[in-house]
Amino acid sequence: MIQEELVQIQELNEEIGRLLIEIARKSIKEEFKLDKLDLSKYDNPILDKKGLAFVTLEKIAYNTSSLRGCIGYVEAVAPLKQIAASAAKAAAFSDPRFNPLQEDELANIIIEVTVLTKPEEIKVKDRWDLPKIIKVGEDGLIVEKGILHSGLLLPQVPMEYCWDEETFLAETCIKASLEPDCWLDSSVRIKRFHGIIFKETKPNGSDIIVIKPSDIKCKLNELINNL
């Protein structure tokens, strides 16, 4: 039964994460007629609550990974299980940055589901205070200006790219197709949210890991260490 209450990330655990990953993969495989997703079989009070989530697809090749799609929802328009299914299908087939996923790629795709809290606008008298208020490793950001400009970056992104708070703000502005210093404009709305990440350890595997954004390692540091 659908519940109007919004799921809280504190309610989530590894088993819920495993179910979300399973739903996401079945949703993608269904498009290739390799599986059938029946959401009614996922009768769980947490999954039946309305939720916000993003699904990220990574393609593994030669021991390296690259982004293959990422789509999500920041409005509580459906139960969490439906959001996971819809976001997975959109990430696989409707991300405008990539060609639609092909069936022969599935064996090399790792699925990641990030469940979000409801975004809250950050209001400050002095816009220069924004870098002092946001927290890299904890906050995700949304930048909005009018109805034409909107950009979102998940909490794990600044950790992966070793950004400080000001760079994080600038990159979110760029994601919204605005100037990097748009966050200083009082007509621009800045929102933040938190998230918890569930990720497959290998493609189509039953093992998953639960990740806090603050635990994400900087990719640049990894590259330097591997030199």
Curated annotation (Swiss-Prot):
Pfam families: AMMECR1. It comes from the Archaea. Residues 15-209 form the AMMECR1 domain. SUPFAM superfamilies: AMMECR1-like (SSF143447). This is Protein SSO0193. The lineage of its organism: Archaea, Thermoproteota, Thermoprotei, Sulfolobales, Sulfolobaceae.
